[in-house]
């Protein structure tokens, strides 16, 4: 359950990073 929450947060962060195009900040994900 906890891992699923992390995955969802990671997906949201990736979508936000792609949207804002923050390559340096998001390359770690």
UniProtKB/Swiss-Prot annotation:
<keyword id="KW-0964">Secreted</keyword>
<comment type="similarity">
    <text>Belongs to the myrmexin family.</text>
</comment>
<comment type="function">
    <text>This heterodimer may have anti-inflammatory properties, since the myrmexin complex (composed of 6 SS-LS heterodimers) inhibits carrageenin-induced edema in a dose-dependent manner (after subcutaneous injection into rats).</text>
</comment>
<comment type="subunit">
    <text>Heterodimer composed of subunit SS3 and subunit LS1 (U1-PSDTX-Pt1f), and heterodimer composed of subunit SS3 and LS2 (U1-PSDTX-Pt1d); disulfide-linked.</text>
</comment>
<protein>
    <recommendedName>
        <fullName>U1-pseudomyrmecitoxin-Pt1 subunit SS3</fullName>
    </recommendedName>
</protein>
<keyword id="KW-1015">Disulfide bond</keyword>
<dbReference type="GO" id="GO:0005576">
    <property type="term" value="C:extracellular region"/>
</dbReference>
